[in-house]
Amino acid sequence: MLARQTIEAKQRTPTGAAWGQERRLEFIEFRLLWDGKINRGELVDFFGISIQQASLDLARYIELAPGNLDYDRSSKVYRASPSIRVVFTQPDAQTFLNQLSSPAVGPSALSFIGWRPPFDIVRYPTRSIRPDTLMQVIWAIRDRQDVEVSYQSMRRPDMTRRWISPHAIAFDGVRWHTRAWCHENQYFKDFVLARIQEIHRVRPSRIDATQDARWHSFVTIVLRANRALTRGQRIAVETEFGMSEGELRVRIRESLVHYFIRQLSLDRDTVPSNKIELLEWVNQSELQPIIAEATSR
């Protein structure tokens, strides 16, 4: 059983040697927890330090976490002891899995993982966003500007040209969009960034983004295990989603509620009657007006 030990932190600067060593001590503990062993060469290879510095780091770790590792002379590695206590990093499954998948989705240099089990991830089609489009939208948000865009809506057969006043961007789990005031429709709505075909002009904006009530307001979505599941299945779902007293409460912006519900197939009105989902949306009737408004725009 891992026991949490707190170490009094000293004031450090990001570029100072103390900060650098603390990062290396975290690395040592991470490798001990997940690989079960570590040697000086791993520190040298990962951080580009000398053998002497690696020895000092291991000695420092042993000083701060006595009993966490034992030296295996035959293999010339330090092995994690069965009674290892957490000092620098709390083991977290999601952190490990995020790092495991990092070579598939980004640079692996930030990952502390040593040995990697065989794995793969499902790669969904990505929405292609033009870099210049994203840059100009971000600049418009920063500088409080309106932008005139050519936009292809899925509600209209042809591309239209309109002014929008972006004030935020958001990711719904599948695609990125900008939250903006639409000067044509005269309300705040979402514009999929990949569907902005061109940005023509910019101008100073007079739109007050604080008036976007749906963006600035939050609601709590209450979920529970589907009552159609067996008792054993419900317990498994409650454990899987980390529910407390049989419920999972998710705080979310009103403007993102309908995306959340859609991704988890929680709307009873759209889920096939013969399909049993893992989760039920407890307070659907309370939040249904938000869904209705969002999907009508």
Protein language model regions, located:
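A generic structural signal for beta-strand entry/edge sites
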Residues: 75-77, 146, 175, 247
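Bulky hydrophobic/aromatic content
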Residues: 80-152, 263, 270-280
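Polybasic (Lys/Arg-rich)
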Residues: 216-297
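Short secondary-structure junctions
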Residues: 67-70, 200, 240-244
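Conserved short hydrophobic interaction patches
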Residues: 61-64, 199, 263-267
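Core beta-strand-centered patch of the WYL/Sm-like small regulatory domain
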Residues: 116-225, 229-231
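Short, compositionally biased low-complexity segments
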Residues: 33, 103-116, 229-238
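Short, basic/aromatic recognition patches that contact phosphate-bearing ligands
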Residues: 1-90, 223, 274-297
